[in-house]
Amino acid sequence: INWKKLGKALNALL
């Protein structure tokens, strides 16, 4: 699991 990618996706949603 790429946490960096998840973090970027979450930032985009937020």
Swiss-Prot record:
GO terms for molecular function: ion channel regulator activity; toxin activity. Keywords: Ion channel impairing toxin, Neurotoxin, Postsynaptic neurotoxin, Secreted, Toxin. The keyword Thylakoid does not apply. Its main location: secreted. It is found in: Secreted. Expressed by the venom gland. GO terms for cellular component: extracellular region; host cell postsynaptic membrane. Toxin active in modulation of gamma-aminobutyric acid (GABA) neurotransmission. Increases GABA release and inhibits GABA uptake in synaptosomes from rat cerebral cortex. May acts on GABA transporters, since its action on GABA uptake and GABA release is not altered by the presence of calcium, sodium and potassium channel blockers. May also modulate GABA(A) receptors, since it significantly decreases GABA-binding in synaptic membranes from rat brain cortex. Belongs to the MCD family. Mastoparan subfamily. This is Agelaiatoxin-8. It comes from Agelaia vicina.
